[in-house]
């Protein structure tokens, strides 16, 4: 069967359901595909198909994750749902499936629960830009005042974690009523909450800035000296674009200030390129730079767009021994390797006050101090390695130095 062509007619946005176990994330995901399928804008994916999610590997970690896709009149969406709580944490930290926005699912009879808080905190730390709330199972509550109290509590929780709690749309409904309805009429009352939710997601979650429109950044993977022409660095452009004549900085892996140089050529597959853009694997020719003055692990970037740092806070998931991780806990002062972009850098871990040790399977915020500064920013993801195997995954939550 011929593959369908992906038509890029609408802006593409990545979303996902988050929230406490059994509050209805998977039921809601299935209900969205069901209701939008009535408009021909999705393929229905059942609860069981989502619940039995396939496993994927990201940064050496196995995660059960289900991707569904659907469209509204305005956008094309990729939506992720994870069956288990640990899978959520691993997904958010590894960025296996990036989220441009999240749908926080909260059961009205229960209100916000521990995992509700944990997912909101993580969403903040991994820089999920916006959130919409689906207040589920409202058909089990007949007291309007209680519903309003739950909404107030949710807005307060969001505000406490750095989201604009007063502005976040809260849509009430019942995902199960929508999913189990036999009606084929899109205007059936039980489908209204799903359409209202998608409208809120369309309106409130911003269309992400395309990577190509951000300042140029390319992690350096390899360095070659070319006789008579100078030094070429190769890598995959992470964001932005680059062309001959651009001024760039070489950042990280040294205690000296970043060096500026001028791009004298861009090549791809041995051919000259007018302009390299995000996603391209390119070679960049640099003026006046010796082969020995640049190395793997540094980045090439638009001047002033990213700075080298050695000390930062990070949210980390520590692999269990069944996942190939450590068998024993570690303590403050532990010195593993941090695999950042294209290379390993040694660093020391400082645990928060009152935390004695970290067990395999834990999710924790810690401070990391690298032996040499590298180009780092909030939201950057990394792996923690020991003797070449991955023992943890992390995301930078704040720069300290």
From Swiss-Prot:
Residues given in the record as GTP binding sites: 19-26, 81-85, 136-139
Keywords, alphabetical: Cytoplasm, Elongation factor, GTP-binding, Hydrolase, Magnesium, Metal-binding, Nucleotide-binding, Protein biosynthesis
Record localization: Cytoplasm
Ranges for region G2: 60-64
Pfam families, sorted: GTP_EFTU, GTP_EFTU_D2, GTP_EFTU_D3
Assembly behavior: Monomer.
Stated name of the protein: Elongation factor Tu 1
Organism, as annotated: Roseiflexus sp. (strain RS-1)
